[in-house]
């Protein structure tokens, strides 16, 4: 028999009854039932119940074992009595009668519990992550993550893509976030950067003629922590293809990712045909370029119904500024919600005020004496005819309600989108048991930066502008669209991509609009710029955020619940104690000196 085990703790079945076996694992818990000891023995694969009674030669030692000790047990497989069968366990029809126990390792008093998985301070969990990872839910999440990545790899290989690895030590590249810099010992005063994405390398692979590339790529961004992003390091399914249009990218990746979702969705419906929604339409209908399509609320403009109306706040705004619009957030009642009345409207208004807004106008409709009429301050101010016209446009009736936002849409659309989401959550309209996918397409190429008072790239600076050189020379830059697209699932951006700009001339023109000269382009993107002068094929691709995809599929509440050794929200690795000061010797070798930041008065 093997030194440590003949079977795993998930392997034994009723067909093994009578066999003498050997198991090794962690003591999950110990129970004493009237002098008979029950030990749940756990390993990576599952749990087996071990029994030791006073007649067992292993009983004396069994009495000493404690939770999370590592032990080896030899014993005989026995069938459980019918009334003690546990159908929730893979090994629930059998138990192991202990004959010999060997203690392989003892455990100190635990800093956090493994059994039962109660809530525990996150910093303790991260400091003792090796114990935290023994918890069933987290352990399953990590195993599921591995399976999902494996499924992605298989899917890409079946589509004829080859996996190539690109450098981790590279040049600094302005891609929207700060770089992590690595000082060079050999080249004093110079620095490598960890890649924010393999963007330039994968494009260079297309120029080199490799046609279909993918990689499970680690990416590094020195960003301030956010709830929907892991600080420091994250992973993406990085993809690039030659001689393709954006439609080719969509029709290649959409079925593959749908298949991955269906494989791990545990029966929840997954969108089979992902709708293509133009960016402008997404902003108008959902107030977001990451719309949660499980929410049935679709916004509409109702400006005409408030122009010259009795509601002077909106009417005066419309008269004073041609950019002003009034958007409606219509909410239809369901059997589950019942009629939507003043109480819901008041809660929504209070929520809006809590976010710093002056409030949220509303109308709710009810039936009185056989007639449907609008109620609330807005309905009273604009009158019966305009209220009825709004209801007719939006398809609203008795029991329904509508919220209103007014101003310059460029300034209020995000709040309108948040109000749409809040209304959907308030009335429980969002179906949590499905995965709703879409592509957001036709992104703006440029945007106006209020902070810097200049034009900047809206997204990926390497995207191909729609219309090419001709559009560049004839259009207002802020009206240019890019061959750029995002994939969205349940309100989360899960992928971003574009058709790339492979023209050196157009590349220089694109960067000139944001204030970078040809010399700047050659200095910052020299490798790519040079490559494009030696025959670059039309190419494009995308990158799916693996961490977010896994988080959605396992239903985790944050990204740290699907990552092995994540940093905390202060970008610290509490387990390894990183970041940490360098030693004087290390600093001397790198010709570096730490200069403390002056303290502010």
Curated annotation (Swiss-Prot):
Segments carrying the region annotation (Aspartate) are 199-202
Substrates-to-products reaction catalysed: tRNA(Asx) + L-aspartate + ATP = L-aspartyl-tRNA(Asx) + AMP + diphosphate
Q: Which parts of the sequence bind ATP? A: 221-223, 493, 545-548
Q: Which Gene3D superfamilies match?
A: Bira Bifunctional Protein, Domain 2, GAD-like domain, Nucleic acid-binding proteins
Query: What GO biological process terms does the UniProt entry carry, in alphabetical order?
Result: aspartyl-tRNA aminoacylation
Carries keyword Secreted? no
User: Can you name one GO molecular function term for this protein?
Assistant: aspartate-tRNA ligase activity
Q: Which cellular component terms (GO) are annotated to the entry?
A: cytoplasm
Task: Give one Pfam family.
Answer: tRNA_anti-codon
Source species, domain of life: Bacteria
Q: Which InterPro entries match?
A: Aa-tRNA-synt_II (IPR004364), aa-tRNA-synth_II (IPR006195), aa-tRNA-synth_II/BPL/LPL (IPR045864), Asp-tRNA-ligase_1 (IPR004524), Asp-tRNA-ligase_1_N (IPR047089), Asp/Asn-tRNA-synth_IIb (IPR002312), AspRS_core (IPR047090), GAD-like_sf (IPR004115)
Q: Where is this site: Important for tRNA non-discrimination?
A: 33
Question: Does Ligase show up as a keyword for this record?
Answer: yes
The Enzyme Commission number assigned here is 6.1.1.23
Q: Which UniProt keywords apply?
A: Aminoacyl-tRNA synthetase, ATP-binding, Cytoplasm, Ligase, Nucleotide-binding, Protein biosynthesis
The subcellular localization recorded is:
Cytoplasm
The record's similarity note reads:
Belongs to the class-II aminoacyl-tRNA synthetase family. Type 1 subfamily.
Subunit structure of this entry?
Homodimer.
PANTHER family recorded: ASPARTATE--TRNA LIGASE, MITOCHONDRIAL, ASPARTYL/LYSYL-TRNA SYNTHETASE
Q: Please describe what this protein does.
A: Aspartyl-tRNA synthetase with relaxed tRNA specificity since it is able to aspartylate not only its cognate tRNA(Asp) but also tRNA(Asn). Reaction proceeds in two steps: L-aspartate is first activated by ATP to form Asp-AMP and then transferred to the acceptor end of tRNA(Asp/Asn).
The molecule here is called: Aspartate--tRNA(Asp/Asn) ligase
The encoding gene:
aspS
